[in-house]
A protein has these predicted regions:
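Charged, glycine-rich active-site and insertion segments that engage polyanionic ligands
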Residues: 1-68, 72-80, 84-87, 93-97, ...
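Flexible beta-alpha connector loops of hexameric P-loop NTPases
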Residues: 116-126, 153, 197
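Residues at the beta-strand->loop junction immediately N-terminal to the Walker
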Residues: 51, 150-151
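Conserved D-loop-proximal element of ABC-family nucleotide-binding domains
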Residues: 126, 158-159, 189
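Conserved Walker B
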Residues: 152-156, 168, 184
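Loop/turn-to-beta-strand initiation segments
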Residues: 142-147, 172-178
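Conserved alpha-helical scaffold flanking the Walker A/P-loop in AAA+ ATPase domains
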Residues: 34-39, 92, 123-147, 155, ...
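Conserved catalytic/switch belt of AAA+ P-loop NTPases
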Residues: 137, 162-176
Length: 378
């Protein structure tokens, strides 16, 4: 990165449009209507906690509402303009300013870029949150609104949360906060109590697939777009990450190996490990590990009696039932937790990723073969 380049943004997914640049929000009409009704009633709450799984449009909705408020300023102006949704035309000056990140009445808080270390800081720091003091203390421009968007609150530590709590406790006039949280239960109860919670739900697979188009640099065919949408479990962000990381092919390779448990094809295992763990393949690594975790979650749900999801590889459903019965549910939950710990420790210690992949499949092989081993010893 050159010195003249803008700093990377932790709330941007790859090369895809940032939520502030996104004009269309699919599948969240109920949440959008709730915000519109609150504003038009003249009783707009000063702080909103937008919750739900990652990648379903929470930040996109926050910026969409911010543009609407900055464009109209008051319910009377919005009503006179005939507003029936939160849409702001892309050629409107407010849209262009917000998209460029240059609107003076919006403050975006996220994990900052550490220029010295050339990476994002691990938390949304207290210094970032304290920027709200000066921002909300200044005079607002046209419309009189000042809007803070926190993406994501999950990244805050205790000090950051306490700094946010102070501004939420004494909100300035015509101030709005949109607090994006994927796991709101981890936030301080006092923060949650000062916000109005707006719960957003995963999108339908068809809505996710509709976003996987040329505008997001997705070149997959219709069947593959729908498969990625289903794998994403209703998250546009995850679907785009799966596309960027070659996730559909990775998932098929992973499942092909898993279907052979309790035996492993060592040659194919090493091919998969090389693909995921090669230097510079960060997207493939993240996507592959996430998809393996998803598969284990589905295995546990299958063992608990939940209906199986649509299969992406022929015979996947039957194989998952067989494996769920090959060991106790507790053993599968235990190995899932151990794999999560192994990956976290490997990232912290910069362990050889190929060794991590081989160890993961060795653990799975051991659990899948435990039932057969018990029968043999009996």
């Amino acid at each position: 990165m050159r010195d003249t380049d803008p700093a990377p943004e932790s709330d941007r997914l790859g090369d895809h449009p940032h939520p502030r640049e996104t004009a269309i929000l699919l599948g969240q009409s109920d949440a959008e209507q709730s915000l519109l009704d609150a504003f038009m009633s003249g009783r707009m709450h000063h702080a909103w906690l937008l919750t739900g799984p990652k990648g379903i449009g929470k930040a996109t909705l926050a910026y969409r509402m911010a543009r609407f408020v900055l464009r109209h300023g008051s319910p009377e102006v919005a009503a006179a303009a005939g507003a029936t949704n939160l849409q702001t035309p892309m050629d409107h000056p407010v849209f262009r300013q917000v998209a460029a990140g240059s609107h003076p009445n919006i403050l975006s808080l996220r994990r900052p870029w550490d220029e010295k270390a050339k990476r994002f800081k691990t938390v949304l720091t207290v210094d970032e949150v304290r920027r709200t003091t000066g921002f909300f203390g200044m005079s607002a421009g046209a419309g009189g609104w000042r809007i803070g968007i926190i993406d994501a609150a999950d990244d805050m530590n205790v000090n950051s949360e306490n700094a946010l709590l102070k501004i939420l406790e004494e909100p300035p006039p015509q101030s709005l906060f949109f607090v994006v949280a994927h796991q709101p239960g981890r936030l301080l109860p006092t923060i949650r109590s000062r916000c109005r919670t707006l719960r957003m739900t995963p999108l339908a697979a068809e809505d996710v697939a509709a976003v996987l188009d040329a505008s997001n640099n997705v070149k997959a065919n219709e069947a593959d777009r729908l498969a990625m949408a289903r794998l994403s479990e209703g998250s546009v962000g995850r679907a785009l990450a799966i596309n960027d990381g070659g996730g559909l092919d990775l998932y098929r390779d992973i499942v092909a190996l898993l279907m052979e448990l309790p035996r492993l094809n060592i040659k194919n295992l090493h091919k998969l490990a090389d693909k995921i763990a090669r230097r510079g393949a960060d997207d493939a690594w993240t996507t592959g590990i996430d998809l393996l975790g998803d598969w284990l979650q589905r295995l546990v749900r299958t063992g608990a009696g939940a209906p199986h999801q649509p299969e992406f590889v022929n015979g996947e459903a039957a194989s998952m039932v067989r494996l769920a019965q090959s060991a106790s549910l507790d053993r599968w939950v235990e190995v899932w937790e151990k794999i999560s710990q192994l990956v976290a420790r490997a990232e912290a210690l910069n362990t050889d990723r190929k060794i991590v992949v081989l160890n993961i499949f060795s653990m799975l092989e051991s659990v899948a073969g435990s039932h057969a081993g018990q029968h043999q010893s009996a």
